[in-house]
A protein has these predicted regions:
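Multi-pass membrane proteins that catalyze or facilitate reactions on polyprenyl-/lipid-phosphate substrates
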Residues: 1-287
């Protein structure tokens, strides 16, 4: 890998980590197109993922600081409620990641065909997120396309912070399914939330905050493989390439994260579904 290839791969990671089109799938596709050897790619992957985590922290630093300040008051306030729901959303992915991560990776491998199939699944989820809430809702505002479904607790009251615990858990299941390459993490979480009736402005923030710890945990598990001798860091990727990939992923991640927040609030996600469909068809034709 040279620094130009690293720059391009970093850009791809930064853009696709937040857009609902699968960063893992696009990294695999672009790596194949550029002819980049898989040797040493683990350390590059860890590096660019850390860059996109940093992008998220920068974009959401105010809400994160507010959540931490409220949480450490050690009383059940809005911030504590929100943090607990994020923790609940992480239960499914923690279960899958800790117990089945290696089996899932062995099952799917680096197959581009798998990426194509998962992109089709992502496309279906995105279309459903635009259409299903309106079909299920009563009194939907057709002109605005905004579902009138509201997140309620079992007691019948509207959920605190706009999302209930069961909705947070279901969204977490969506995140757990996204371990498959080509199944977008942001796409599945946002789509699952919208299908469950969570408002767009709520999912625009919750979907990005809920993935921070799982992404860091995933990279930590990869590093544990190195410690255990199952993988090697530093093989074939120079510090210059790592730096180029990190900077590209961080800057493009900042832009993509801010853009995606605006898109989730206002735009139809079906346009991304069309993109996923086109890419999947191209994979099936040329892979």
């Amino acid at each position: 890998m040279n620094w130009i290839q690293a720059l391009l791969l970093g850009l791809v990671q930064g853009l696709t980590e937040f857009l609902p089109v699968s960063s893992s799938g696009h990294l695999m596709i672009v790596r194949e197109l550029l002819g980049v050897d898989g040797e040493g790619f683990l350390d590059f992957t860890v590096t660019v993922h850390l860059a996109t985590v940093l992008s998220t922290l920068v974009v959401f630093w105010k809400p994160i600081c507010r959540l931490l300040a409220g949480f450490f008051k050690f009383k059940y306030n809005d911030e504590t409620d929100y943090v607990f729901k994020i923790v609940v959303s992480m239960i499914p992915v923690a279960f899958v990641g800790l117990l089945f991560k290696d089996k899932v990776e062995a099952l799917f491998g680096d197959s581009l065909t798998t990426v194509g199939i998962c992109l089709l699944v992502t496309a279906v989820l995105l279309v459903l997120s635009d259409t299903l809430p309106r079909l299920l809702a009563h009194g939907t505002d057709i002109a605005s396309g905004e579902s009138q479904v509201r997140p309620f607790t079992r007691s019948g009251r509207e959920a605190r912070n706009g999302i209930s615990y069961w909705q947070a858990f279901v969204v977490g299941i969506g995140q757990a399914l996204a371990v498959a390459p080509g199944l977008s993490r942001s796409g599945t979480t946002i789509a699952t939330g919208l299908i469950c009736g969570v408002k767009r402005e709520v999912m625009a923030q919750f979907s990005f905050l809920m993935v921070l710890v799982p992404i860091l945990g995933e990279q930590f598990l990869d590093l544990l493989k190195v410690v255990g001798g199952d993988a090697v860091l530093g093989g074939g990727v120079s510090p210059l390439c790592l730096a180029a990939g990190f900077i590209a992923a961080f800057i493009s991640g900042l832009l993509a994260c801010k853009a995606m927040i605006a898109l989730v609030r206002k735009a139809k996600l079906s346009w991304f579904a069309l993109y996923c469909l086109v890419v999947a068809v191209l994979i099936f034709i040329f892979a």
